[in-house]
């Protein structure tokens, strides 16, 4: 039993030695190292120890440098944070330049580091009306900047710290309709054809664009609604704004007539720029005849300014860069005095006429405005419609209001047919009376 370990131990020792030799060969230890004397191996070991110490000191130095760089980065980040919290100086980007310096400096010549930078540089104009060249743009990526952008810069170094949102005139921002109107197409009587034409030209291209793409047709850019006063042009525009999810901007023609030269044209530009930013959007211009009259020779500066405002409107309607996501709805009572350039195809493509309501339409209008009232069952709307000849939609609504006031005056709980007849007489008296006042 005791002989087995003595027999196996030499074999095991040889295997271990073979393993050591294999590892030595794998580790790249040459035969010359194995043939070295003890003193040489001790000397080699001391050399390796010294190299290890040198490498450790190098690692320690690199670690210190890394920590110093981290501290510097932290300090710079805090400086940037402090600078960014300061009030910005508002500026506009005038131009972006590509800088590629030529290496033609003589040996020993002084070299300006700013002049040797490569990449993008910027020219800005501050709100203090000063222009600066920035060899280093700042914290904003140069690829995200374009001429005309509004930026915030440091008031001392003028480095660009942040891009600011586009500035629009406060009057243009007030034109945006925040609260949706409550009118619906069912609240409009006698204008079924006009509603269909408006939906086809404005609503369908926004909600179902693929239908036009499948047919290969281009939808109309704008709609002109014209007709006598009180026929429902503005009411239909409010219903269109309520039924679409697009941004709705309401302009009035007299708003665009300003005292200072170029102010009206700037309002038009800002309105269309805001509409493009918030596309899809609808611009409704009421009383277009205030600025869209035919051009004529005039020596008055006011007339020329109105014509310049109309020219800017023409350019925005059919400019060099058309936008299919912005639709224009214009309304006017005097289509006969509009400039032919506004009426041509390509600007206000579809013209929708709003005629005076016929007998059936007048009956429908009075039914719509009376549906929330306590009306007696004996009210005959067809007879009322026959009695309201030459009434427009607004006057038919006024008849319902007057009938309600008459019923309220006599303390009734419901409106009768006679109340409506008296209301018709009241509206006719207001319509036909010719009052003259004497001092």
UniProtKB/Swiss-Prot annotation:
GO terms for biological process: blastocyst development; modulation by host of viral transcription; positive regulation of proteasomal protein catabolic process; positive regulation of transcription by RNA polymerase II; proteasome-mediated ubiquitin-dependent protein catabolic process. Its main location: cytoplasm. Sumoylated by UBE2I in response to MEKK1-mediated stimuli. SUPFAM superfamilies: P-loop containing nucleoside triphosphate hydrolases. ATP binds at residues 227-234. The modification Phosphoserine is found at residues 9, 376. One of its GO terms (cellular component) is extracellular region. Keywords: Acetylation, ATP-binding, Cataract, Cytoplasm, Deafness, Host-virus interaction, Intellectual disability, Neuropathy, Nucleotide-binding, Nucleus, Phosphoprotein, Proteasome, Ubl conjugation. Coiled coil: none annotated. The keyword Nucleus applies. GO terms for molecular function: ATP binding; ATP hydrolysis activity; identical protein binding; proteasome-activating activity. The modification N-acetylmethionine is found at residue 1. Disulfide bonds: none annotated. Component of the 26S proteasome, a multiprotein complex involved in the ATP-dependent degradation of ubiquitinated proteins. This complex plays a key role in the maintenance of protein homeostasis by removing misfolded or damaged proteins, which could impair cellular functions, and by removing proteins whose functions are no longer required. Therefore, the proteasome participates in numerous cellular processes, including cell cycle progression, apoptosis, or DNA damage repair. Component of the 19S proteasome regulatory particle complex. The 26S proteasome consists of a 20S core particle (CP) and two 19S regulatory subunits (RP). The regulatory particle is made of a lid composed of 9 subunits, a base containing 6 ATPases including PSMC3 and few additional components. Interacts with PAAF1. Belongs to the AAA ATPase family. It is linked to Deafness, cataract, impaired intellectual development, and polyneuropathy: An autosomal recessive disease characterized by early onset of deafness, cataract, severe developmental delay, and severely impaired intellectual development. Patients later develop polyneuropathy of the lower extremities, associated with depigmentation of the hair in that area. This is 26S proteasome regulatory subunit 6A.
């Amino acid at each position: 039993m005791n002989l087995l370990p003595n027999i196996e131990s030499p074999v095991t020792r040889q295997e271990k030695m073979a393993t050591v030799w294999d590892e030595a060969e794998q580790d790249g230890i040459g035969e010359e190292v194995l043939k070295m004397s003890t003193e040489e191996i001790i000397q080699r070991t001391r050399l390796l120890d010294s190299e290890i110490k040198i490498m450790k000191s190098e690692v320690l130095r690199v670690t210190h440098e890394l920590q110093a760089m981290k501290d510097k980065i932290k300090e710079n980040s805090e400086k940037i944070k402090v600078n960014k919290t300061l009030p910005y100086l508002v500026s506009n980007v005038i131009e972006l330049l590509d800088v590629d310096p030529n290496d033609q400096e003589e040996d020993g010549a002084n070299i300006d580091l700013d002049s040797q930078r490569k990449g993008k540089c910027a020219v800005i104009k501050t709100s203090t009306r000063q222009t600066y060249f920035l060899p280093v743009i700042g914290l904003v990526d140069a690829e995200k900047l374009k001429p005309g952008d509004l930026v915030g810069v440091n008031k001392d170094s003028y480095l660009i710290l942040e891009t600011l949102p586009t500035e629009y005139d406060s009057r243009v921002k007030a034109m945006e309709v925040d609260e949706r109107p409550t009118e619906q197409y069912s609240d409009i009587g006698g204008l079924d054809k006009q509603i269909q034409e408006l939906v086809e030209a404005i609503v369908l291209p926004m909600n179902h664009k693929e239908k036009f793409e499948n047919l290969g047709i281009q939808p109309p850019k704008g709609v002109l609604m014209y007709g006598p006063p009180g026929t429902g042009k503005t009411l239909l525009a409010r219903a269109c704004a309520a039924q679409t999810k697009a941004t709705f901007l309401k302009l009035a023609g007299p708003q665009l007539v300003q005292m200072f030269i170029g102010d009206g044209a700037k309002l038009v530009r800002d309105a269309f720029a805001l509409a493009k930013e918030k596309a899809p959007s609808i611009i409704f211009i009421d009383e277009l005849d205030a600025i869209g009259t035919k051009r004529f020779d005039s020596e008055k500066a006011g007339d020329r300014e109105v014509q310049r405002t109309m020219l800017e409107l023409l350019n925005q309607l059919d400019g060099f860069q058309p936008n299919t996501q912005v639709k224009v709805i214009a309304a006017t009572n005097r289509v006969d005095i509009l400039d032919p350039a506004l009426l041509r195809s390509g600007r206000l493509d579809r013209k929708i006429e709003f005629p005076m309501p016929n007998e059936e339409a007048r009956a429908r209008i009075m039914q719509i405005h009376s549906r929330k009232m306590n009306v007696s069952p004996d009210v005959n709307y067809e007879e009322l419609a026959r009695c309201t000849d030459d009434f427009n939609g607004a006057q038919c609504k006024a008849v319902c209001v007057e009938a309600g006031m008459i019923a309220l005056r006599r303390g009734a709980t419901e409106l009768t047919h006679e109340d409506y007849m008296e209301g018709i007489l009241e509206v006719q008296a207001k319509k036909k009376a010719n009052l003259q006042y004497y001092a």
